[in-house]
Regions:
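Positively charged, low-complexity terminal tracts
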Residues: 1-113
Length: 113
């Protein structure tokens, strides 16, 4: 399999542990009307960096990140949808409310080779 070219890198670490630089090979970033910035980046370790950045004025955490394997990312999304369905929330309606009705989403994809 052909090795993908890095388009950037991210520094990962936790607490007092060692920091390490990981190459990003693919990504998509969406900016929503409320200036929330959501990024899904695929890394050279075959894992995903999921990031949500909020404006300071939102009162929410300014940045939240998760670094997950493909299996863990799939399990997270599946469990979220399962939770919604269990509580009587239609996932498609929820996505429509927050995503499809937002006419001002700006998308940025990494370039394809």
């Amino acid at each position: 399999m052909e090795e993908k070219k890095n388009i950037g890198e991210v520094t990962l670490g936790y607490g007092d542990g060692p920091l390490r630089k990981i190459g990003i090979t693919d990504m998509v970033r969406c900016e929503f009307a409320d200036h929330r910035l959501v990024t899904v980046a695929y890394t050279e370790e075959d894992a995903y960096l999921l990031s949500v950045e909020n404006p300071q004025s939102s009162g929410r955490a300014t940045q939240t990140n998760m670094y997950l394997t493909e299996g863990s990312a799939a399990a997270l999304f599946y469990t979220y949808i399962l939770y919604l369905e269990h509580n009587g929330t239609d996932a498609n309606e929820l996505f429509k409310k927050y995503i499809l009705d937002d006419k001002e989403i700006k998308y940025e994809f990494s370039p394809k080779d």
